[in-house]
Amino acid sequence: MIDIVLNTIHKYNMINKGDKIIVGVSGGPDSMCLLHILYRLRDEYNLNIIAAHINHCLRGKDADNDEKYVENFCKKYDIDFYSTKIDVGKLAKKENISFEVAGRECRYDFFNKLKLKFNCDKIALAHNSNDQCETILMRIMRGTGIEGLAGIKAIRDNIYIRPIIEASRKQIEDYCEEHELEARIDKTNLESIYARNKVRLELIPYIQENFNQDIIAVINRMGNNIDVDREYLDFASDKKFYQFCTSTKYEVVIKKEAFLEHKAITSRIIRRSINRLKGNLYNFERVHVEDILNLQKGSTGKFITLPEKIKALNNYGDIHIFFEEFSDNKGENKEKEQILEIGNNIINSNIKVQIELTNEIHKDIMGKDVYVKYFDFDKINGNIMFRYRKDGDRFTSLGMKGSKKIKDLFIDFKIPKHLRDYVPLICFGNEIAWIVGYRISEKFKVEKNTKNILKIKIEGEKENELV
């Protein structure tokens, strides 16, 4: 058994020497086997192991006994132990989700809090090859695609690792018996009350008896084969994502050119965009990908509402995906103004404005960097200001003779409505000198006889965070 685990660890490069690892431990055979094996590898890999247990409050005294069993085991083997109690039944009812989903969410939340608290490297989970088979069969019955057929990943985000994913339940039970681990048994796993239990207790035994005795190994092999193709598609679509998408913590924009790619790539770009925005793909299904694909084919200004208060907007063929509350906060920036000084200025905690006087003009004056601009300092009257648009604002764009309403310019620039109150403006006195990211004013441009040059550079806290 330990050889199977070592082979999996080496194959996927799961663990490095000196890693600090959180191990999710329910007290059942799978997690106790995993914890015991990692304990045996502790000295060889110089591991720091933390056992994490969640009492789901679903099985009364049995659940309390599970927690006590894991705690005592950890004391015996000198393993750090942390536990929490979460009423999964109440959580499921409150969030209108299944017990299974609620349990998974609270487990991952607890594990990640511990990871941050103790600066851990990995989170080890106790899925095995039987779990893999059950998961893939359940996904097939839901009409899954390649992502689902690939099954549970052995390693995800270089954080979540599954060292016993290639071991069977029988091998795990034999290991527990050999080492007298006396793992706890959740009696509900032996009852056909959940869909997964029916797959485990009824469907798989039926297939084994009537079609293929090795169905678990066969399904696992299929998942591994498909995973190779999935990895390539992910690699190809990731490249396209960075080519065609921009993102902030508030929204992701998919350029219209992305929708000229093969549907397999475009679909993955959409999924990647949702994942970038909300951190996961829970409640986001194939039908929502199709909805966004159809939205892009429609007219500008149209939008759809997606799960978890997310909206998608067609803006001249580009698709903007954002949280509803972002668009609902329109106008909150109108009163935000800040006088800027020579040197570094911090705006709203996440935008930095650097201002300096210079006699040199670099190549980026020709527009190569939309967030660095030069102005004739001697033409400036009044304070240098940072603000957002106001009703009645007008602007004389570079090359224009007369002024134009900011509202009309934003339409010309194809800035979607929900972003227009977030476009930064640099003003000199009462005059708008720069619509950041778009245009500078004709009135303050640098000319041949300019003596003193003002250089302004604007940076977001993260890439693409300015608007």
Swiss-Prot record:
Q: For ATP, which residues are the binding ones? A: S26, G27, G28, P29, D30, S31
Principal location listed in the UniProt entry:
cytoplasm
- Which transformation does this protein catalyse, written as a reaction? cytidine(34) in tRNA(Ile2) + L-lysine + ATP = lysidine(34) in tRNA(Ile2) + AMP + diphosphate + H(+)
Q: Where in the cell is it found?
A: Cytoplasm
Cross-referenced SUPFAM superfamilies: Adenine nucleotide alpha hydrolases-like, MesJ substrate recognition domain-like, PheT/TilS domain
InterPro entries, per the entry: Lysidine-tRNA-synth_C, Phe-tRNA_synthase-like_B3/B4, Rossmann-like_a/b/a_fold, TilS/TtcA_N, tRNA_Ile_lys_synt, tRNA_Ile_lys_synt_N
GO MF annotations for this entry?
ATP binding; tRNA(Ile)-lysidine synthase activity
Instruction: Give GO terms for biological process.
Output: tRNA modification
What EC numbers are recorded for this enzyme?
6.3.4.19
Q: Name one Pfam family in it.
A: ATP_bind_3
Keywords (A to Z) from UniProt: ATP-binding, Cytoplasm, Ligase, Nucleotide-binding, tRNA processing
Which GO cellular component terms are attached?
A: cytoplasm
Family assignment from sequence similarity: Belongs to the tRNA(Ile)-lysidine synthase family.
UniProt free text on domains: The N-terminal region contains the highly conserved SGGXDS motif, predicted to be a P-loop motif involved in ATP binding.
State its role: Ligates lysine onto the cytidine present at position 34 of the AUA codon-specific tRNA(Ile) that contains the anticodon CAU, in an ATP-dependent manner. Cytidine is converted to lysidine, thus changing the amino acid specificity of the tRNA from methionine to isoleucine.
Name of the protein this chain belongs to: tRNA(Ile)-lysidine synthase
The source organism is Clostridium tetani (strain Massachusetts / E88)
Provide the organism lineage as a comma list.
Answer: Bacteria, Bacillati, Bacillota, Clostridia, Eubacteriales
What is this protein's gene name? tilS
